[in-house]
């Protein structure tokens, strides 16, 4: 599990850095990577900005090789080899975080503000 502290304005850029690391360093097929967030506005920003040059698509619009970027609510019950859970604030509830984090089979990255990553590293309540 990797925790990446990010200020809200830099969350999408941090996702790009982590995508590059997962694809290049860990050699994970982009089609086996899922980017999840609790907020539709952040999901839409990630899709629009193609962080790190990686195309991120909606579940229903994905093509071979696309990274899926969705809200945690939409992906409940589905898994991928690698998952990046990203938020620009620390108000995601423990249950929602757990659902997002539990989608990862082998690699999990959490990108968020210091308060969130610190709480998770300490084994925050309910996590």
Enumerate the language-model features and the residues they cover.
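Core RecA-like ATPase module of SF1/SF2 helicases and allied nucleic-acid translocases
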Residues: 1-127
């Amino acid at each position: 599990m990797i925790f990446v502290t990010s200020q809200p304005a830099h969350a999408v850029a941090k996702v790009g850095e982590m995508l590059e690391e997962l694809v290049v360093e860990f050699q994970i097929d982009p089609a086996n990577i899922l980017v999840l967030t609790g907020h539709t506005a952040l999901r839409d920003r990630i899709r629009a900005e193609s962080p790190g040059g990686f195309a991120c698509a909606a579940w229903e619009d994905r093509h071979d090789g696309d990274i899926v970027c969705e809200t945690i609510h939409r992906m409940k019950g589905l898994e991928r080899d690698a998952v990046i859970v990203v938020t620009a604030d620390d108000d995601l509830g423990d249950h929602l975080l757990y659902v997002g984090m539990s989608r990862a089979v082998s690699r999990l990255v959490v990108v968020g503000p210091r308060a969130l990553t610190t709480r998770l590293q300490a084994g925050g309540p309910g996590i």
